[in-house]
Amino acid sequence: MFITFEGGEGSGKTTLIEKLKHTLLEKKYDVLTTREPGGSKVAEKIRSVLLDNKNTEITAHTEALLFAASRAQHLDEVIIPNLDKVILCDRYIDSSYAYQAFGRNLGMEFVQSINSYALKYLPDLTFYIDLDPKTGIDRVKKNRLHKTDRLDMEVQTFHQKVREGYIRISEMFKERIVVIDGNQSIDAIYQIIMDNILKRL
């Protein structure tokens, strides 16, 4: 089962994935955790270019293409060979929709066209953790273990457009996207997600 987790900066995805992995392993499921951009050696190198806050000259189209390239490598190396497992993936195609199609105003048609390969492997289930961008960025700033990246440094209006994009996407693909209020405690969000996963496994 291929499960993805989406949300703006500071939405708690990484923490939740670790908690879910621990529980699913205890229940004897074969679990793989991974992330985008990244997840494999080559894809992680692309990630470092994308998120390096010194690379301010990256254009919107280049950014979108790099995300798509990282995703293709990740699919071939990690996702497709492990589709018989429970895959918990931190971000996937919906991040490109929210950040590039809406946040960068590139539009859904362009983003879908460069991600046509990934569209053949859509998640079985996606959890979108909805959170006000200011709350999320404040959380990121308070987390000293988090290194501020290029996307964290974007202005508030960009992050607001990303959130609006996620809401639109959730309406477009409601058959696979579960929207969760990110203002709840991590434990409450975890329980909602776990209940949804166990219903489908």
Curated annotation (Swiss-Prot):
User: Has keyword Membrane?
Assistant: no
UniProt key word Kinase: yes
Any coiled-coil regions, as ranges = none
Q: Which GO terms describe its molecular function?
A: ATP binding; dTMP kinase activity
Residues bound to ATP: 7-14
Spell out the CDD domains in the cross-references: TMPK (cd01672)
An example GO CC term for this entry is: cytosol
- What residue ranges are annotated as transmembrane? none
State which Enzyme Commission number(s) the record gives: 2.7.4.9
Set out the biological process GO terms recorded for this chain's protein. Answer: dTDP biosynthetic process; dTTP biosynthetic process; dUDP biosynthetic process
Q: Return the PROSITE patterns for the record.
A: THYMIDYLATE_KINASE (PS01331)
Entry-linked InterPro entries: P-loop_NTPase (IPR027417), Thymidylate_kin-like_dom (IPR039430), Thymidylate_kin_CS (IPR018095), Thymidylate_kinase (IPR018094)
Which keywords accompany this UniProt record? ATP-binding, Kinase, Nucleotide biosynthesis, Nucleotide-binding, Transferase
Catalytic reaction list: dTMP + ATP = dTDP + ADP
Family statement drawn from the similarity comment of this UniProt entry: Belongs to the thymidylate kinase family.
Q: Describe the function of this protein.
A: Phosphorylation of dTMP to form dTDP in both de novo and salvage pathways of dTTP synthesis.
Q: What is this protein called?
A: Thymidylate kinase
